[in-house]
Amino acid sequence: VTNRDAKYEATVVAKSATVTYDGKEHSAIGVETYEFVVDGNTYTVTGLSTEDPTQKDAGTYTNNITGTPVVLDAEGHDVTAQFTVKTENGKLIINKAQVTLKSADLSKKYDGKALVNGKTALETETGFAKGEGATYTFTGSQTIVGSSANAFSYTLKANTKESNYTISKNEGTLTVTDRGTKYTVTIKANSATATYDGIEHSAIGVETYKFVLD
């Protein structure tokens, strides 16, 4: 039996995996197969190993194949000389998780007091891994008739890495509308009473321009 003029080809492919960040470890382990059937005969490639990356954080990690391939036939004979063995590294891809944050839309009739978010929770807060998240500070305020953003900022918790997330931040609207029944305000000019004494006397200004409502 002589060597083949044209060698058989075998490609060993390392396993790959693609997941979305969830705070847990993920792996890409081993290869798709070490066994190949050529012309009805089964062959096994030995001598190779994979790095088998295990990671938690978002990123791309290579599952490298290392070693020197040895090809054995079904009876265990070394037939490496009859083969060209190629390798393809795999990848562990952990994609960033998508987080959506949105403050609420709030409204009220004008009452002279600022409309703020207060203790109202975010309307939408989705995508954080279990045990991870953020704290929020609301700065939006609307007092007069009109509307403005229910503005807020966030600070990620100590155990939460920004690099593991793509965060979409949307602000709701604070709206103050006209009152159905208007307030009634009476402004009184100051009065004065005096007895004639040959001197000028005056009644100047108003009692007050300031009013407390509700």
Question: Language-model segments: which ranges?
Answer:
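Solvent-exposed beta-strand/loop surfaces, strongest in extracytoplasmic domains of secreted
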Residues: 1-214
